[in-house]
Amino acid sequence: MKLHEYEAKELFLRYGVKIPPGKLALTPDEVRKIAEEIGTPVVLKAQVVVAGRGKAGGIKIAQTPEEAYELSKKMFGMNIKGLVVRKLYVTKYVEVEREMYLSLIIDRASRRYLFLASPIGGVDIEEIAKTSPEKIKKVYVDPSIGLRDYHIRSIISWLGFKPGSQQWQQTASVIQAMYRIMVDYDAELVETNPLALSKEGEVIPLDARVIVDDNALFKHPDLEKALEEDPRDITEFEAYAKKIGFHYVELDGDIGIIGNGAGLTMATMDLVYHFGGRPANFLDIGGGASREVVKEAVKVLLNHPRVKVIFVNIFGGITRADEVALGIKDALAEVKEHTKKIVVRIKGTNEEQGKAILSEIGIPLFENAEEAAKKAVELAKI
């Protein structure tokens, strides 16, 4: 789960880190009111969980409440990398002396936490690694030992602050908070970029990112609730699929894929790629899928504006071919207004009954997956 910036900053604040005053706004009127409350200039920041907001026009500076209002009218509803802006975080502008980078990740190879620190900030760590790799400091933390003073000293010294200074103490607080968030919230990433030294000499996180392990969300009901209320980085189709109970991942192609089992579904995608097509999605209905689940899966792709062809590839064990066929038939009966072509390869339990049902409604059937994939690609190019 990717937290919005305002949510990540709330965690930083909860763990004792000073951040610039700011509030969340859902309308232009709220933006103006917040700007009046905290004082201008302010920064308007689109709350979408993707990198590169600034370059996409998702971060603006306003000198007056009225300017903030006018800018926000243009920002609400804008599309940034496929995500629609529905929230703006309005925060006090901070004059910056210099920008730094600090993140904490899990290094799976060493089974340790890993701090990445650089005196260069405000750009992606990948860009720093490419242009100035010597500027990146790596500090490993063994979880069985925990964060120690020598870890903190190593990081702060690299960032260029003197022991005993105000900046040293403030940076230490940020490092400690990041580590506690990482552990307490089962995070995969905690990052501040830039970590700024202000003109007043204070060390302040101007941006914050936190990614929490989805498998640990059951331990954090507040985050689970927030995810239900705001799906954030998942599309409307992914949100619907999750609600129904099948595994769905959005891609950028035009051939819809439905399979049973992750391995078969991925192999089906590979076949489509092999024959020159582009999958629109990964959709695994799972083992033993019912007629109802199949119907909802097919409806997702029938309603998807980018999908031209739906390729259903089923190998039935506990998944019955007749149930799959009836699900396809039901979906087509419910979604009458569509222009999609459907290609089916179906084998296994109750195969003959399933094929008979599909033949009655004119669905093309194929004996092997290769021929079915070729046909799907061919139809998508028409």
Swiss-Prot record:
Its EC number is 6.2.1.5. Pathway: Carbohydrate metabolism; tricarboxylic acid cycle; succinate from succinyl-CoA (ligase route): step 1/1. Mg(2+) binds at residues 193, 207. HAMAP family: Succ_CoA_beta. ATP binds at residues 45, 52-54, 94, 99. Keywords: ATP-binding, Ligase, Magnesium, Metal-binding, Nucleotide-binding, Tricarboxylic acid cycle. Disulfide bonds: none annotated. The keyword Membrane does not apply. This is Succinate--CoA ligase [ADP-forming] subunit beta. It is an enzyme of class 6 (ligase). Residues 9-240 form the ATP-grasp domain. GO terms for biological process: succinyl-CoA metabolic process; tricarboxylic acid cycle. The keyword ATP-binding applies.
